[in-house]
Amino acid sequence: MCGIAGRFNFDAAHPVDRAQLVAMTDAVAHRGPDAGGYFLDAGIGLGHRRLSIIDLATGDQPLGNEDGSIQVIFNGEIYNFAEVRHELIAHGHRFRTNSDTEVIAHGYEQWGEHCVDRFRGMFAFAVWDGRARRLMLARDRLGVKPLYYAEVPGGLVFGSEIKSLLEDPQVPREWRADALDAYLTLLYIPAPDTIYRGIHKLPPAHVLIAERGQVRLSKYWDLEFTGGHDGRSEEDYLEELDAHLREAVQLRMISDVPLGAVLSGGIDSSTVVAYMVDASDKPPVTISVGFEHQGFDEVAHAETVARHLGCDFHALTASPRVEELLPKLAWHFDEPFADSSAVPTYYVSKAARQLVTVALSGDGGDELWAGYTRHRVEHWEQRVRGALGPAARAAGWLGQALPLSVKGARSLRHLAANPDQAYALKHAYGMFEPDAKSQLYSGDFRRQVNGYDALATFRDAYHACGSNDPLDRSMYVDARTYMIDDVLTKVDRMSMAVSLEAREPLLDHRLLEFAARVPASLKLKDGQSKYLLRRVLDKRVPRSIIERKKSGFAAPIADWLRGPLAPMTNELLLDGRLRNRGIFNDREITRLWREHRSRQADHEHRLWQLVMLELWFREFIDRPGGAGQQTALAGRAAADPVAAPMSA
């Protein structure tokens, strides 16, 4: 895993400033602590930070073709690089390394921008074509690896993280009111937007081409849900799922450095580890982390799976100094991000890095296999709509009349909404919903965001799905929104914070293409989520794991806010700086904090959002050059004592 950064000036007579390129690249040094490299030519500058995984001796970047006219910087892994390399050699290409990076260089020579169709993996890369003066940026199909860009006067800047772009003086630190509204609705800012005006996320499965002063984007892949009604038997689907899982895991075990897996004891990570056992001639290293807090420790479940499968199991209990960690999290995410599971993700990544350089995880199992509660609720609501017909809307109107504190009122309200809006609303549950935002915002800020709809992205994705099955549509929405901008963003930043490469076998694009063809009835059956995944895991792990209810990857933030985070929260929310931003109603902020501290109500998610927002403001907006100044602090994260071994 690595970090990339660069600048392209359309005018070849306008050179890229080397010191600026070095600063952009150094901003992501945590992503690649092993080596750094640069390429500068007429109007182009490419920078790279390397975390060595494959071809340790000769895989440094930037890396070019035979005559140097093509240059590549690359973050990620091409898992089928050996297969593509063999094809390219047959076409007459000559290789001087064994790295997957060189496959990109020669692949571009052979197929141009369509080379991405050949690649199987997680990637974000830049290709410079010196002869054509063309820059190509590409991001993998699911958005596992991040890539940001900004058009600036006379050129384009890009990088693995926003902080690289902020090192360029032509990139303004101007925040967007609509993006802030989206954050308070969802916990994150959906692609292609960022909190910064002019900075964009390159969407997954997209290529960007910059040449002759023009920039164009094109999409090269999408998930195609078909409804899965092709007459095949359940056993046929089960057999094919087994084959896809076996291949996806085997491909991700290719490494020249120590490799293991993060294990929670849930269905997804247990599935990955079970197939790792099949693919390895020695017990795989597995790591689990729990908290010293009742109800937030999954180590016992993980140990049950690990012992049953014969793994080399390592369990640690985190004793987080969360008040010291949160400013570092704000720095690593670059923009407001409030999924509190970033905290346990950071600690499990840190624990894993003590033992391995590459860790496989179970991320992706929920989105395409109906693993979330909202999938079951969506399925129930659709059945009720079908059974009640017009009466469903009457039930919905009743829900509108009831306060949300009344049990079941929210589900009744959803019955009155169109299915696309009902599912979009599920993503905002527990955060600042429209009524809550109306109370939270100042009158001036309310006017600024009037007419903006943070949920439009979800409705658009709902209708873009090729299947009419409501459950298929809801899973497609999750795969194109929440999974990319929340789950994968969290995993990438927290693993890269400690220079750990995370790999997600359940997000293999061929496995996902298969999942999209599986009937929804084999994902959610008799009220049981992930039905087919559970079946493939049956007889591999104890029944207690198969039948275990999903618990999520949570942290005890309600108690942290009343305990170790209370002084910081009090200062961040009430010292006047937040009030002076003119965004919020000060009395509403005070009410939320007072009610939570006194246990009158639980506002943990909303308060967490406000805390992370204010930390971001202070790091990236209030302090000129703040992103760079925080580098040393973030670098110290690796030295913090955060976990103690329980067993090994």
Regions found by a protein language model. Name each.
Residues 1-333, 345, 349, 539, ...:
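Cysteine-centered catalytic environments shared across enzyme families
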Residues 1-4, 8, 23, 41, ...:
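Adenosyl-5′-phosphate
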Residues 87, 168, 368-371, 514:
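Residues that scaffold the ATP/ADP-binding catalytic core of kinase and kinase-like folds
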Residues 141, 347-405, 482, 487, ...:
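Active-site adenylate/phosphate-handling loop in enzymes that bind or generate adenylated species
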Residues 330-332, 373-380, 627-628:
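Short secondary-structure boundary/capping segments
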Residues 334-339:
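Short, flexible loop segments at the rims of nucleotide/cofactor-binding pockets, characterized by
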